[in-house]
């Protein structure tokens, strides 16, 4: 999308992977610019300052409660065995750092009363719980990149659909997964396979009840300066009582020339379905939906998988699907 001539996406869509082969594949079709310098900052209101995230060990000494934090870090176990997100962070960095950086932010992000509700949390630490060393970039253990072109990933969709017939502005009225067909413009159309990219509750008519989701209200704000964030900082997180969670400066990603800059401000919302709830209970309900789908129906992407996936694992899902079809592990519908 563009706003006032500024390119943006609904939420940042930087590419993250540890798989060099996967990065090479995408880079062949959509030239990518690696951004290893990518940093996050989190505003901690009680300290009246920003700190890096992941939490950096070197910045603890700059905190007003450093002595308390140091004693808590000393008491942290060498290996953690958490049952929920709160336990993960308290065991990893102690209660004070957890309360500063995670407690309010996570409750705000998911609109929950307690972080003990979140029982699946492998994505939360942005790589590590407590970062050390001179490099304060977020993703120095993975490839962090973004498309060079101003249209972002759009060219990838042209490549991936080059040998298909694409029906634009088409509404699917109903899906019959058992017969591998879809009702379009009042006519049933049969297909060998179905690839679903929306929540499985839609194509199975809510058979097992609604899945829980969190969404975002997204506000685009143009500012009359060329750049507002510090060098190498792409995101700002807010871990306090303000209603918003994150601000993104899109010029950092797109590198376009303008005397102004666009920021995107995100507020948790129930208006859309963008983030699947990361609990065993919610995953179990999603599994009921997935298990009810015939083998020729593939669930691809964050919504269909009901997993907190980004660009790289979604491309990998598509590659895995192709591999299954090529070796005949999945038979097309009769």
Give a label for each model feature.
Residues 24-28, 88, 97, 231-237, ...:
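Structural/interface elements that position substrates and couple domains in central-metabolism enzymes
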Residues 42-44, 51-53, 98, 108-114, ...:
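Short catalytic/ligand-binding loop motif for oxyanion handling, primarily in non-cytosolic enzymes
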Residues 55, 246-334:
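Conserved flavin/dinucleotide-binding core of flavoenzymes
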């Amino acid at each position: 999308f563009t706003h006032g001539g500024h390119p943006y996406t609904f939420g940042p869509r930087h590419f993250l992977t540890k798989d060099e082969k996967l990065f090479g594949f995408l880079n062949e079709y959509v030239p990518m610019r690696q951004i290893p310098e990518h940093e996050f900052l989190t505003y901690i209101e009680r300290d009246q300052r920003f700190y890096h995230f992941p939490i950096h060990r070197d910045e603890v000494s700059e905190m007003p409660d450093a002595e308390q934090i140091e004693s808590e870090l000393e008491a942290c176990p060498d290996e953690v065995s958490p049952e929920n997100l709160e336990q993960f962070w308290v065991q990893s960095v102690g209660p004070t750092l957890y309360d500063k950086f995670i407690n309010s932010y996570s409750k705000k992000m998911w609109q929950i009363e307690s972080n003990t509700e979140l029982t699946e949390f492998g994505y939360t630490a942005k790589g590590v719980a407590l970062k050390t060393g001179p490099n304060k970039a977020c993703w120095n253990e993975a490839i962090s990149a973004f498309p060079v072109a101003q249209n972002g990933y759009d060219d990838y969709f042209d490549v991936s659909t080059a040998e298909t017939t694409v029906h634009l502005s088409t509404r699917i009225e109903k899906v019959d997964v058992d017969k591998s067909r879809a009702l379009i413009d009042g006519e049933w159309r049969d297909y060998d396979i179905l690839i679903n990219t929306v929540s499985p509750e839609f194509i199975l008519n809510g058979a097992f009840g609604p899945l829980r989701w969190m969404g975002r209200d997204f506000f685009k704000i143009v500012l009359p300066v060329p750049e507002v964030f510090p060098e190498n900082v792409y995101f700002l997180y807010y871990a306090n009582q303000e209603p918003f969670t994150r601000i993104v400066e899109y010029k950092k990603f797109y590198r376009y020339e303008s005397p102004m800059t666009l920021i995107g401000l995100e507020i948790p919302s129930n208006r859309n379905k963008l983030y699947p709830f990361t609990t065993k209970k919610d995953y179990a309900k999603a599994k009921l939906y997935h298990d009810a789908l015939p083998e020729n129906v593939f669930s691809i992407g964050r919504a269909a998988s009901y997993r907190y996936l980004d660009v790289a694992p979604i491309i990998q899902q598509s590659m895995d699907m192709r591999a299954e079809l090529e070796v005949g592990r999945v038979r097309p519908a009769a």
